[in-house]
Amino acid sequence: MTDCIFCKIVEGKIPSRKLYEDDDMLAFHDINPLAPVHFMIIPKKHVDSLAHVGPEHVEVLGKMMAKAGALAREAGSAEGFRTIVNTGRIARQDVYHLHIHILFPGQANH
C-alpha cells in the first residue's frame, strides 16, 4: 500500500529502531511507547488487520508469535509480557497494517 506507514518502514522510506528483520517480518520499537519496553512485530507483506488474515498468513503469524517471545526475553522480560493486537476502528487500530504490540514494565536493553 502506498500510504501505509508500516509498508514505508518495511521499504526503508521511513526510519525505525529495528530489533529484528527477516524475509517475512520486521520488529521495531514503538515511537510512542506505552511501557518502558514496547515494540511491534509486523508482517512485511501488507495485511490490513487480523480480520483479514487467511490460510496463506498462518506461517508468518506463527513465526511472528514465536519471535515475540524470543525478543521479549532478549529485552529482559523474565516475568512475562503483554501481547496486543488491535483489530478495527472500534478496537483503536490506528495503523491498518497488522501489527502485534509487545510491552512490559522492564528496563529496555535496546
Q: Each PLM stretch: what is its role?
A:
Residues 1-110:
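HIT superfamily nucleotide-processing domains
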